[in-house]
Amino acid sequence: MPRRLLLLLALLLLPLAARAQSWPDRPIRLIIPFGAGGISDSVGRIGAEWLSKQLGVPVVADNRPGGNGAIGMEAVLRSPADGYTLLGASASHLVVLPLMQRLTFDPQRDFTPISMTAGNPLVLAVATGMGPTTLPAFRDMVAARPGQLQYASGGTGGLSHLGMEVLLQRLGLQMEHVPYRSGPLAMQDMMGGRIQVHLGNALDMTAARDAGMIRLLAVTGATRSAILPDVPTVAEQGWPGFEVTTWNGLAGPAGLPVAIRDRIAGAMRQACADDGVRRSLLRIGADPLCSTPAEMAASMQRLTPIMREAIALSGATVN
């Protein structure tokens, strides 16, 4: 390449480098594509508070619900890739949504992964009176009654529904799906004896487990949950490699300067070493993760074929 052209490129890149070095010098907006309340909103706000302290500028949580998350995501994509507008998203938005809904953007192409902040473990629960105390025992019981037993989910096409379909396929089982409007509503009916099996968030289940009303058989992540360390994984109980994971994390628009991306990710890694942040996350039922950008990107790529298979198994339609 001619020396003059190299010099011109260097001059053009100088303003970008200068902006990255001076960042941040004004408030940062964290768009959360959920309504206020709930675990995903809480994880986003915990992250925003920590980043405010670490970066020395306000990080303002901005709830933008609607379109199953697409409205908030589009708002981030319309913003400059300068680190002043970030997305507090989940695996549902960045992985499942593009498989379920026709979008004007591709999350894996149009966003920069920064950090998986916290995991939201899915847990298989059965009513205490049902009998099984392990996943193999559950498999044997359901296999003896194909298609006769029901399981509840927090809604058709949601992660509790899709995750259960993948689990049933791996176990070689058939059950009837009973969708609810939310996980807590499914848990209410489970505690009332109207449903006996549910795959849902750990936070929705701990009180019922502690009261002896349900039994937790397995978590679907690759490792045990810090929230429920006594509950074994599916893989531990005879199905190696099984993993259905959901998490909340931070992303920016494509083209976010690497220096800014890495500074945010570094701040979040420090968050998971902070006892106060860890306690705050565990209190709301979230496992502290605080991953690197590469780990978040790898998780998105790994989950995509799993969720594509789950959607096909579930019969859910693409809108």
Name every feature range the model reports, one short phrase each:
Residues S92-R102, L168-R170, V197-V231:
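A ligand-binding cleft/hinge motif common to bilobed small-molecule-binding domains
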Residues R78-Y84, L99-L185, V234, W247-S280:
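Hinge/capping helix and adjacent helix->loop/strand transition within the periplasmic-binding protein
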Residues M1-L12:
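N-terminal export leaders
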Residues D25-P27, Q169-L173, V258-N319:
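An extracytoplasmic/periplasmic, membrane-proximal ligand-sensing/linker region
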Residues P15-A17:
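N-terminal signal peptide c-region/cleavage motif recognized by signal peptidases
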